[in-house]
């Protein structure tokens, strides 16, 4: 893979946490790529490591880190080699921004939303508050927030409007990439659809790339160019969206898609039996083996990553 042709190239990224029970392998040898003006959707069950992946990319690390290593190339530069000051000046909120989970509830209730959105621009773009507020109004226009809302407080806005404000805050420094962690959770269906339309418009108008972290398959499919399936801290399948949604390859991916209710069928959605493994002291074999209907002896060994019809799948079935 030529890292110069990719906006983001992640190679063997690892983030393990130290706990009393042992090391939690939240992100373990993760690999994937993201091109310019593209969107990758990271799908998986709760607790599989999706949010930890976003923290690993942005180096937002807790104190109990046991292992943090790998390569993260942003526009051809391995930013894992940056010092913390270099990372803050060139990557976090500059090259890559984050809309965290429940972002609409993270706004300061006693500060006007315009001032909150302006703050990253003042800090990272080294501009005046007046210039920053002018930029905020432009970002509000892109995300569908009335410009006069710069003087309002968060409690005066609906949940959907606060989510748009959080998105404007991520956009205000003009990053090439925005990571969105469950951006439509806790929103009603109509508001979810509106937020996804905003993201598609931003992608088209500004050329912004996205990593969309979610467990909502139906909603995320509207934005996805690529799909990455995460299970127990690992990426088990990556594929173009046009190939993945009609024909997923990994058994977990197949069962995940079969669990989505469909309107024009009498078939009941599938339930994935069993529980995901604990991320502490994981075995060396396939991490989905205990729940997999296709399990055989080889699954006790670490599965290879196999290239199949343009997709990459971590499974012995395709070796």
Locations of regions flagged by a protein language model:
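Short catalytic/signature loops enriched in Gly
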Residues: 6, 240-319
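A short, proline-enriched helix->beta-strand linker immediately N-terminal to the Walker B motif
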Residues: 172-176
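P-loop NTP-binding/switch modules centered on Walker-like glycine-rich loops
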Residues: 59, 177-179, 183-267
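Conserved ABC ATPase signature
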Residues: 153-157, 161
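ABC ATPase NBD coupling module
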Residues: 78-97, 115, 123, 243-248, ...
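Conserved ABC ATPase "signature" region
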Residues: 78, 130-148, 257
